[in-house]
Amino acid sequence: MWLPYLIGQPSRMRPLNTTEGLGDRLRLIAFAERQAFHAFNEAIIRFPNSPKGLLEAWHWVALEEAKHESWLLNRLAAIGQKIEDRPVSLNLYYSLQNCQTPKDFALYISDAEERGRIGAEKFAEVLKTQDPETAEIFKQIALEEKAHIALVDKYF
């Protein structure tokens, strides 16, 4: 489920203006997308009595998370960095597993998605001259996260 990621205590991020530092961030965010993918799919099973339409929406978001992860991992490879070079944490996934109701899950993951959206917007801005290709990926992810976040208001 988590391979080829190296699970463990994350190392300190290296400077963003280095290839390694950019790789650290791409890896971290790609892994957050992987955790969200699995959490959404598991929520579909855990909360079968969710509001009508929500399970289908979660399935759609899970596929979106996988798409974002693939973009980030492709970029990670393009800059010569490996997924398994640095450890990543399962804290997000474990936190989502602690949610006891569909609403708790939706609120918690929406908050995580909002933090991710803000981070992606900041990376897009910071990287637009240093690395326009990565900046564009983050810009698109931030844009798409808005639709994921809006699900909370739609269903709760």
Regions from the language model: what does each represent?
Residues 1-156:
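Non-heme di-metal
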